């Protein structure tokens, strides 16, 4: 499983890029957090104030292990700010998944996460 934490304004770029490589299923959540940048200082009518927890997007994708590298490269390329990136661009975690069960059908494992037209079908892998 890939868990990516990205900037809010990069979500559409990342989704579009993932779709081009055949990633059809993902979960997306709005979250708040900070990393090395530690938040930002905003200025308003009443003065400036520190915002410690910044809005971010969390994307979770369950996929075959042999598709992880291509997917990570795609996320990095589409989520990075500018040519060299910036603090706050995000992180990608690669995690093991012990088992997947599709609730509707009871399918398990790889069959539970395959979609018509997805990355595995594009690579010629069948159910």
Feature roles, as predicted:
Residues 1-127:
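Positively charged, small/polar-rich N-terminal and surface patches that mediate targeting and assembly
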């Amino acid at each position: 499983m890939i868990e990516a934490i990205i900037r809010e304004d990069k979500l559409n770029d990342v989704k579009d890029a993932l779709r081009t490589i055949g990633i059809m299923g993902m979960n997306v959540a709005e979250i708040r957090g900070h990393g090395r940048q530690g938040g930002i200082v905003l200025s308003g009518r009443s003065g400036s104030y520190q915002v410690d927890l910044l809005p971010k997007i969390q994307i979770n994708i369950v996929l075959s292990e042999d598709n992880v590298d291509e997917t990570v490269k795609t996320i990095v390329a589409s989520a990075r700010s500018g040519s060299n990136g910036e603090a706050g661009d995000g992180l990608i975690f690669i995690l093991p998944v012990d088992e997947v069960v599709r609730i509707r059908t009871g399918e398990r494992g790889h069959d539970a996460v395959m979609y018509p037209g997805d990355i595995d079908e594009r690579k010629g892998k069948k159910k």
